[in-house]
C-alpha cells in the first residue's frame, strides 16, 4: 500500500479514487491535483513511480488543508460558534439539527438513537 500523508491508499484502485481516501480530498480536488502534475487519472496506485508519489505528497502538504489540520480547523469553528453563543452554537451544544429542519418527529440522525426511560414502578397497595 502507498502511504501519503499518513493514509494508506488502496493499490488496486485508480489513483483518482485512491486520493479520495484522504480526509479533505474529494473527487474534484483529486482530479485537479492529477491534472496539475500531468498524471493519467486512470492509472492504478501501484503503477505510480516514486517520483510521482513524492510530487503528490509535496502538493498535498503545501497547497491543501487535509487530515488532522482540517479536522482541527472544523472543531475550532464549532467551538467558536459555541463561545459566541450564536444560534448554531447553541444547536451544536444541544445536539439538535442546525439548518432549520423539523425536530418534532424526525431528528434521529442528529440526536442519536432513542433512549427509553423505564417508568416508575407503583408502590404495591396494602
Swiss-Prot record:
Top-level taxonomic group: Eukaryota
PANTHER family found in the cross-reference section: 30S RIBOSOMAL PROTEIN S13/40S RIBOSOMAL PROTEIN S18 (PTHR10871), SMALL RIBOSOMAL SUBUNIT PROTEIN US13M (PTHR10871:SF1)
Span list, region Disordered: 95-126
Name by which UniProt lists this protein: Small ribosomal subunit protein uS13c
Keyword annotations from UniProtKB, A to Z: Chloroplast, Plastid, Ribonucleoprotein, Ribosomal protein, RNA-binding, rRNA-binding
Basic residues bias locations: 107-126
Primary role: Located at the top of the head of the 30S subunit, it contacts several helices of the 16S rRNA.
Gene: rps13
InterPro entries, per database record: Rbsml_uS13_C, Ribosomal_uS13, Ribosomal_uS13-like_H2TH, Ribosomal_uS13_bac-type, Ribosomal_uS13_CS
Cellular localisation: Plastid, Chloroplast
Family listed: Belongs to the universal ribosomal protein uS13 family.
Keyword Metal-binding belongs to the record: no
GO biological process: translation
Subunit structure comment from the entry: Part of the 30S ribosomal subunit.
The UniProt record lists the keyword Ion transport: no
GO cellular component, one term: cytosol
